[in-house]
Amino acid sequence: MLSIHAKDCSLASLIKSRKSTQYEYLVSDLKEEKQLYYDRLSIYNSCSYYPYDKNYDSTNPKEPEGDEVVINYSNSVSGNQYYVFPLSASDQSEIYNGSVAEVLDNLTEGNHGAIIRFTGTKSVKVSMKFNIRRSDKSNYSIRIVAVQGSQQTVIREFKNGTGTVEYSCDIPKIYLSSGSMLKVDFVVGIGYNQWIAISQFKYFTVRYSSIDDPVNIDVVTPVKLLNSLLKSMNDNKEGITGEIITGIDSRLDDCLIIPAESARAIPDAKIYSSYTKFQDWMEAEFGFVPTIDDDNKKVTFTHRNNLFNESVVKSIDEVSRDFSFKVNSKLIYSRVCVGYEKKDYDSINGRDEFRFTNEYITGVDLTDNTLNLISPYRADAYGIEFLVQKRGKDTTDNESDNDIFFVCAKFSPDSLRYELVRDGYVVAGVISPDTMFNVMYSPRFMIQANSRFIGVFAPLLTYASSDGNSDVSIDGIKENGNIRTGVPLFTVGELTVTTDDYDIPSNWNGLIALKYADYAYSGYIYETENRFARYDGVRYKLLIKSISSIE
């Protein structure tokens, strides 16, 4: 990562010595007066079931063999007979919101053979896979049936002989009204003492979407956390001011920090961070870097691009000695890793999350350097949702309790609260596009924020892999696509020159221009050295912006 060598000062030295220290604060001391209205993320719930042995009045039941589950029956009447497919709920179910569905015992009287009752959900999918074997005279079909009061409607019927049963179907919304139930049965024709045997059982699941009730969350602004960190590094004394320039990136202007303990509503919630984590987050996510004003004791975060002004602030008329040019290999990277550290949710929804790490190759094979633009703060929507779901359920520590999350939210003067920003972005390839949030913090937007710096060594980033959902597209642009970078801030060339001109410019953001051996050079100050006790000139090390021949 590029760092411009700043003039040595007491404030810079203080920050350097304490930047890695992690500080903790009570959220109540830093929080905004108004809270974030978190209106939740729609997620999948998965009810898993397994079959069990059942005898429906067979006088000569077959015994199971190996891993078989056997359903025995006897149908002595003419026509078809209907039996409930014996299924029991598994402890491997992932039910995050039990208020929109109730798992049932399908053989309990009054449940109409149903395995689940719905009270308000938008989508349901039934999936199954297992092997089945039947007796010689057993002719059967498996049915998925919607139960609405006394009315029963067959949604899907699977006719099958011996072999693998692998089906899935979506339940139409018309059958998902409050109180509707879902049952699975099988139909057999006439025959005495018949059976079907199930083996090699893989799964039988009912997945449904749900969205929980909204909650309010305490939030902290980035500039408030910055000033708290500066005060802590200054021995809890006032005197150092932190500022974040606004009006450059709306993703930052509308950014709010959510401490993990606030998401869980833990009493006396705390927030944990070091200055280094804050700085790394600002740089990776927004391309913002700090400038230090020792005279005014001020740390200002602004976009890196603003530190490279294309106006000439000094012309060196005479190069006295030590002219050398080289390629700065530290500015050349073969890979770029951007995003966030991957988190394992142990959930079916985890595969939907896309705010993890994406890896790109630059086409450069001269080095094996990797540019890591990894945010230590988290933007994963599912991480926030799962923490909120833990509210009131337990008080034990969670491995995510020390984490910091952030969201994009605007203050609503009508409702007097912060509300998530979802407008302005069209997202596809996720479970619930309508409720998804933080899409503006995807790895692709992080690359855009750092585009001109990446452009120094790579005009094109070629997508290689992702730790998360790589099928997402935002505003019609795929997250797994290649990315062209911006106009480079400078080149990888580095020029060292010594001059007897002792007039060092006070503005280090502009260009230094000089001519040497029929070429004109311009570049930005990377480092200067001036030994006043010895008359040996001023030594400049420049990051070259341009080289042109002198006609």
Model-derived regions, located:
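An acidic/polar, Gly/Ser/Thr-rich interaction patch typically located in mid-to-C-terminal regions
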Residues: M1, S93, G242-E551
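Surface-exposed cap/loop segments at beta↔alpha junctions
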Residues: M1-S88, Y167, Y175-I240, V538-E551
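Solvent-exposed serine/threonine-rich low-complexity stretches and specific carbohydrate-binding patches
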Residues: Q152-G163
